Structures are given as structure tokens and as C-alpha cells.
Amino acid sequence: MESNSISLKDVWAKTDPFQSIMTHATLSGLAAQVIWEKLPEGVQEELACLLSITQEQGKAWLGYLVSLHDIGKVEELFQWQWPEMRAQMEKAGKKPEFADTKVRHERTTVAALNERIWKELGAEKSLRSFYAGVLGAHHQGKDGEGGSKHTKNSSFWNGLQAELEETMRHLFLKTEVAFFPPIEKPQKGPAGALLLGLTILSDWIASGDLFADAETWFDPEKTWAEAEQKVERFLEDSGLCSPDVDFGREFSEVWPNIPRNGLRGLQEDIEALFAETEELISVVLIEAPMGEGKTEAGIYAALQMARQWKKHGFYVGLPTSATSNQMVGRMRAFLALHGLEDTVRLLHSMAWLVDEDLPEMQFDTEEKAYAARWLLPVRRGLLAPYAVGTVDQAMMAVLMVKYGVLRLLGLAQKTLVIDELHSYDVYMSELIERLLEWCKALEIPVVMLSATLPPEKKAQMLSPYMTEKLSQDYPAITAITETGQVVVRKIGRTEKHSVVSVSLCPILQDPEQIARKAAELVQDGGCLCVLLNVVDQAQTVYQALKQMGFDGETLLFHARFPAERRQEIEAQCIRWFGKDKSHRPKKAILVATQVVEQSLDVDFDVMMTAVAPIDLLLQRVGRVFRHEDTPRPPQFQAPTLCVLTPRDSENYHDVYPPCLRNQSIHLLQDRTTIRIPDDMPQLVADGYDMTAAPPEELEHWMEHLMENEAMSSASTQYLIRSPGKGFSPMKTPESIQFDDLEQSGFLSAKTRLGPPTKRIVLLEEEAFRQLAERAKKVEGIRILDNLSKNEEKDLLKQSVSIQEKKLEGKQSSTEVLYGRKRLEGLLVLRGEQKDGTIFYHNMKLDHELGIRFQS
């Protein structure tokens, strides 16, 4: 048989069912062009600008580039892997000299384009290396070598590769002469990230079941429009694109439920800032006390910046999944005001319990597990126009995580809002700083919100945009334009001026005394919060309160409850202490950890709090006298804060550095009041200033600074390079340090520096036995991978996250089941039930107290 008996229509790209390389290449380029059309205009303009071409040329070039991503499959070692092709190759006399099952087609793609095809077309070395490198990274972290280059059949396969390139060039570029957009090193980072993200997304869509049978019907000359419509429908049905919405420019247009005469000072000032600033604004930082309407002002700013930069929508990143769950409800209510129901996606590892999934899609690609995770509803939220979730989801965009570029592509289409900026530690702040560098490079507008922010942290968060000394006005809005102009607007009118009574109470190490003090404070009625820094202490104080026979309502709230029980407690917390006063108890004590510190809209008459860094104490004050319309007992005329301190600080340990705790004590020991907001900026500045500390604290401060340095260094090992340092696609297993399995307890790429955690479910023996009967035994362990979606949900609702070290060496193979797929990383443990409590080694699960550990 003649050598030309194998044509491009015979060369396989997919095998089940068969799809030729010609069909897959064409559909991938077509999908890329449809995605391009659906991108916000700002992203089109930016990518075209980075490549120094027009938007029309950008669409053509993208289709051409993406269509060639699998050209490396046109190679003998790769084709030999499929038995049906093997027979055809033998018949045609094209049997390879040796076989290699580890051949990586994307490596062949790079070599074919960079070393031969594009070189022969006259492309400059730096350009062909860059563009080939983008395509070579579309399967991230795969090990193996490229195909054979110098064998007896090389010229035949090289000829087919050249034919494929020429066909795609005519189809997409519509020219005999190839052109290669010029690009300089500083632009290669952002351009490479966008091009790679678009390549991956296009490949996955072309590999989905939309086109599983495309070989039987797709013809570029006859059914091009039909294929385009399929991609468009998928993007629309998936919520991956949306029409540009004009939310208006006035605050009351954006928030139609807030009348013009009801605007708070901050809201008037943010509106004026955008009206008076002519340049495009790159970043806005809003610093204001609790209760000033920061969220509404932040969303207003986000939408104005999206309009300016021709982007669509926003991603709101928050510190925890609990705060995300709350915020998604607020954002859905907001978008419903504009007729955009059901458009907000929720993103965190357990989000699919809260957010209902859309129909699932199958993918015929070796990356189908990742394609499914990314293009099924929960994950693709970062690509959707409106999304809310943990800030980790955005931070992963700059970690060495598989397919992190898809996160950058998603963020590039919208405004990023980072809420509760004060709550992130040194390690997370380093990650956020790198994220902001990429935001600037990709023209992603950013809004940051904070109640209190130390000057040093403020400077760090704004350093990607400016280096000059910052104003310390408070409360204030700081905006930086695209040219680096800094606009600072001091908020002229604050709604809440209060004088908080503050006292130190040295009983932190005595749970019985804390319980007695709490009961005394509300003996004549009132709602009190006892806020402690560690779960064990909260459980002990709650038990002491119950044992002393307190005659009011009590509730314990912390993070070590199973997911469903935690949601119940959160709902009860809001029912009792939230905006609706109809269920507010006459007398109640909530014992809690930091879960009530952030974004929960609850209001207490008085608070007792364990000592913490000063900015966090001020944040906690925001939960006292929060609502003006709350009926209060006569003994509570002003907000009251009782700060619990240790008698023996040297032997007291919690989650905060001793020097910051002791600095708070030092700053408050001679005070009886704090004026909100007047005293806040100076207190926060002094709280983080070593020179304001007494001399005996110097050793603690030095330890703290060394720990900060170590945390800062730790973050760099996980970060991708700054955008200005060129394009560094993650192609090899060595360069991708981490997987992107959010379900696995917590992401293996560290967005937070701390002890590793595991998500566990404690089941009593009979429930465990029933589940174990359905488990598969694989390599000596029992795995759960065949449960229905509802069964998976029921199991995850019973799950709780604990430190991994608490489990070390305890579980035997007979008492543990390992979750897979959506349950990835989950451990199901067999416990023993006694009197409503489930025991497992030194751990016990109690309905009222949550998970407890016994020494």
C-alpha cells in the first residue's frame, strides 16, 4: 500500500468514539473563537494589545494557535498506541522501529512547531519558542518524552504535520503567509497565561460529549455554524458567559433598595470618587468601621470598575466557607434586584452541598477528571461572571497548582473583591500580594475591604500599584489609577460614633470564673457573647455554664461541628441575634470562637473576649450594639467589652503571637473607653509597632518577626513567578508542586500555612457496617466511589475538619473507609455509640459540644 494511504482523516485524536486529528483540531480552534467572542471586550482588547494586533486578528490567531495544540499526536509512536491504528500502520508499511507508551504528544507539539514547522515559515526563535511553549503546557505536569524525530518514517509524519498546520492556517488565518504576533518579555507572562487558559478550555469543550460523535456530522464547509451554536449554548447554559449588564452609575441605581436620602457617608463618598476621577481606577481600598455599609460600597466600586475596564461581574473572596455561604445569599438578593436570578456561583471545597449542580457533562480527554471538575458547576464558578467563595480560590491562581491559569482566565474577566483584608496572616498576605501583581498585569480591577488595617499591611497590599508613602487617614477610601495616581478620600460622615466601655479581666485561664462572670453580666437580662480563641476552651466554658445552672438560653458555636450541625447552629445564631428581633431571647449567652468574628451579622448587648491582637479586638467590638433598633435591657446603655487576660501569660498559649496579645493588654490597661472610629487608627498602628511595646516584650517581638520572616519565605516556594519575569508554563511534574483537589481535606497547595487537616465522618457501628459493605477493596484499603450524589451529600453533611495529627497512627484498615471522586480526601471512621455520643479512640462526637479530644 502506498505511504499516502494514511491521511489526516485517519490519524486519531480520540478513540472512543474515533475522532480524527483534523476534526479535533478544527473544533478546538472553532471553540476558541467562540469563547473569544464571548469574552468581555476588555479581555479581547487586552490580549490584542499584549500581542500588538487588532481584536479581529486576535480572534483569527487564537483559532489558529489552539487548533495546533495536538499536532504532536501526528507522530508514529503516539499513533501506534491504538490497536486499530496499529493495524493500519502495519498495512501501510509505517510500523515504528520501537514502541514507547510514555511518549507525550504535547512535547512533540513543541518540537514540531518550534524546531521545524514555524522555523521553516520564518518565525523568530523567541516567538516560536513562546507560542509553542504555551501549547506544550496544555496537559500540565505529565512525565515523558516527545516522539521520535529521526527514523525511517519521520519524513512521512513530518509531512502530515506540515499539512495539518497549512490546513489550519488557511482555515483560521485565511492566508498563505503565517504571521506571528510580536511580544516582548514583560508581556509574555500575562499573554501566556491568557493564551494557555483559553487553549485548555477550548480543548476540553471540544473533547466534551457535545462533539463525541462529531466525526459523523462535522464538516467545516457545511456544519461550522451548527458547531458554533453548540459551543455557544454550552457556554450560556453553563453560566460561563453572560450579557453585559448596565447597573448604572449612581449608587441608588446599583442598589435600588437604598434610597438616595438613605445613603451612608461611605456610600456617598465612593460614588463621588468615581464621578470625579477621570482615569481608569485599578485598585480601591476601603477602610471603615463595622456598620458603615462597606459591602454595598465594595460591590458598587466593583461594578463601576468592571464597566470602566469593560469586564463583566465580580468574584467576592472571603476568609471562610461560613462567611462565603452568608455572602452568596446577599449577592443573590442583590442581583435579583437587577433581574439576574440564580447567577451567583458559590466556591469552596464544600460548596456543592450548598449550591445545586447543573446537569453533568462527560469528557473524552486524558484530563477528563480535571475537565469535569473545572467545567462542572462548582469549579467553573471562577469562570462565571458572578461568584462568591473563599479567598483561597483566587489565591490558587498564583500557586504552582495544576490548571491555575484557568483561575487567572476567570479573574481576568471580572473585578476581584477581597473582603475582611485584615483577617489574613503574613503567609496569606504574601500570596495575596503576588495575586495583586498578576491582577495589575492582567488589568483585573481589585476592591479590598477592611475594618482595620495596620499601616505596614496596607503598604504591602498596595505595593504592586505604588511605592510612595500612604496617607493614614481613617476612615478612608484609597484609589490608585492605571497611571499610578493616588486618590485618597477621607470619609466625611460616619454613621456610628460610639464610646465602648472596656475593661481587662484576668480570668482567662479559669473557665468557671468566666462562666460566673458571664452569668452575672446578664443576670437581669441581655444577650452576651463569650468569644474565645480556641475550641477546647470554648467547650470547657460552655460546660461550666451548663453545670452552674444558668437560667437563660445558651449556645455553643465553633468550627469542630459536623457541617450540617454547624449550619443549624449558625442559623440559630442569626435567628436569636440577627437583624430580625422577633426571636431575640430576653437572656442568652453565646460561647463561640472566631466563627462569629467575620461577616456574621449578629448583635450583642455585651461581649467578653479572650485577648487577641488589637485589630481583631476592634473587629469583635463591631458585634456589640451593631443594630440601632435592637431593644436592650436598661443596664446596657453603651457597648461594653470585657477583655479576658491570662494571669500567667508565660504559660498561656493560643493561636496568636504572645507579643501581639501582650501589646493589646499594654494598650488597654490604662483605658476605660475606646472611641469608635476616632481611636481605631492609632490603636491599630500601635498594636503592630514594636517601638510602642515595653522593653520586657522585646524578646517576644524578635521571635514574632523571625516567624513572620519564615512564613514569608515559606510562601515563595509555592508561588508562580511575577508576571514581569516572563512566561513560565508548568509543563513538568517537577514544576507543578500541587494538585488541585479541593475536596481532599484542604488543598495540598498551601493557601494557608498551618497544620494539615483531614475531613472525617464519625459513624456508629451499624451505619459504618452498611457503608463498608458497599466499599471496594483496592490495594489493601476500602474505598467509597459508587455512592449516589444524595448519599455523598448526606455523608459530607456529617463531616468535620480536624487537624491531621489528631489521627496519626490511630486508624486500622477495619475501621476506616476512604472517599474518592467527590468524596476525595474524606475518611469515614467506625466509632462506638454510648448515650448519644460517638467515641473513637481519644475523640468523641457530641451533638451539643461537637468533636472533643481527651488527653
Predicted regions and their residues:
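Walker A/P-loop
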Residues: E279-A302
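C-terminal helicase lobe and adjacent C-terminal extensions/tails of nucleic-acid helicase motors
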Residues: K458, Q509-K581, F604, M608-S855
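Accessory nucleic-acid engagement/destabilization modules that flank
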Residues: E2-F247
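Conserved Walker A/P-loop ATP-binding site and its immediately adjacent core
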Residues: H312-F334, L346-A351, P455-K457
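Post-DEXD/H (motif II) to motif III coupling segment of the RecA-like Helicase ATP-binding lobe
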Residues: L409-T415, H422-R489
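Conserved interdomain linker/interface between the two RecA-like ATPase lobes of SF2 helicase motors
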Residues: E468-A538
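Conserved pre-motif I regulatory segment
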Residues: R249-E287
